[in-house]
């Protein structure tokens, strides 16, 4: 897999992958805009033919300029179990620490064992503290056919450059 920043043309692929992975899906427009405006803080994993097998989207928090917020991680079903999510996270970690950022944050539902393990291994291997705190409660989300689970904030850092 080749890791690189996304291009505008990747927006539709990120949308489809998010849908297929069962992530909270945003509009195709949002993913396309993301690939334009936040390409420098995101990554896509491409197979030999250029197809998108995974992505990480994130941004530098405007009110906390030393903190990267990881918004979504998606890995195609055929590429799971091969360490691709961790490889993309390491890629982002190297990029943000190289830019002088000290913290990585994300939100995770309490039942998402895979994401919790991913962030725990990242923090451990980087020798960085990891802290979990409640952030969004069910009441913060609109009620629909399925109630949205709460989201806890994971904060990792400070990260060494």
Model-predicted segments: where are they?
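Active-site rim helix/loop that mediates acceptor-substrate recognition in acyltransferases
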Residues: 19-48, 52, 57
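Conserved beta-strand in the GNAT
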Residues: 51-61, 67-69, 74
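Conserved active-site alpha-helix within GNAT-family acetyltransferase domains
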Residues: 86, 110-132
């Amino acid at each position: 897999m080749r890791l690189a920043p996304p291009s505008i043309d990747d927006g539709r692929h990120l949308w489809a992958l998010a849908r297929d992975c069962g992530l909270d899906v945003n509009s195709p427009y949002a993913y396309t805009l993301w690939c334009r405006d936040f390409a420098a803080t995101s990554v896509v994993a491409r197979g030999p033919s250029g197809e998108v097998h995974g992505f990480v989207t994130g941004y530098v928090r405007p009110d906390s300029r030393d903190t990267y917020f990881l918004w979504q991680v998606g890995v195609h079903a055929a590429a799971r179990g091969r360490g691709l999510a961790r490889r993309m996270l390491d890629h982002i970690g190297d990029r943000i620490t190289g830019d002088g950022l000290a913290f990585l944050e994300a939100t995770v539902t309490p039942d998402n064992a895979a994401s919790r393990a991913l962030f725990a291994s990242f923090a451990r291997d980087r020798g960085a503290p990891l802290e979990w705190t409640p952030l969004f409660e069910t009441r913060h989300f609109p009620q629909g056919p399925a109630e949205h689970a709460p989201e806890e904030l994971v904060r990792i850092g400070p990260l060494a450059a």
